[in-house]
Design a protein with these regions (language model features):
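Class I S-adenosyl-L-methionine-dependent methyltransferase catalytic core
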Residues: 1-175
Length: 175
């Protein structure tokens, strides 16, 4: 949970049916691990009461639009949950934050996950709202973070080279 605590007005927003249909046609998800009964996009889903973080994701084709006030546990679980693959829909404007630097960037550099920045700004449904109002978009773009087996069983970021080694390599190539 972020420094402000849970934020239901943000955390309970749902992917629009149109955007989800595009993703589902591409990935054929088997479960939505961060849903509510009102916004679930698949027949199989976990709600906050089910605690998707505590569930076994082994062999699943996971869709996850996590609560944006608590992203890190979901990204960490994606690495260690044993799923066939996990697609996380995340805000693209938080690449400086610790969770991104711990759980996305090192794996992206190592080539063990994909980051796909989505064009424009997605729309999200508020609880009880059947359609998104015109010009109602979040103030940020989104991205997909995609992890595929066998990298969904990795529990720690790959080792980073020591700064001294990088400098030595650069100096050696310049000589």
């Amino acid at each position: 949970v972020d420094r402000h605590g849970p934020r239901p007005h943000i955390d309970d927003r749902a992917t629009t049916p149109e955007d989800f249909a595009t993703l589902h046609a591409r990935f054929n998800f088997s479960i939505d691990v961060a849903a509510s009964a009102e916004n679930a996009k698949l027949p199989r889903f976990y709600t906050i009461e089910d605690d998707g973080l505590a569930q076994d994701w082994t062999g699943e084709r996971v869709y996850c639009n996590p609560p944006y006030s608590s992203i890190e546990p979901w990204v960490e679980k994606a690495h260690g949950g044993g799923a066939e693959f996990v697609v996380l829909l995340l805000p693209a404007n938080r690449t400086e934050q610790g969770w991104w630097q711990r759980w996305v960037e090192p794996f992206r550099r190592a080539g063990t996950l994909e980051v796909e920045f989505l064009p424009g700004r997605m729309r999200f449904l508020k609880p009880g709202q059947p359609v998104v109002k015109p010009n109602e978009r979040p103030p940020f773009g989104c991205c997909l973070v995609i992890l595929r087996a066998p990298h969904t069983g990795v529990h720690a970021p790959p080792a980073q080279p020591r700064l001294e080694d990088v400098i030595s390599d650069i100096e050696g190539k310049a000589a």
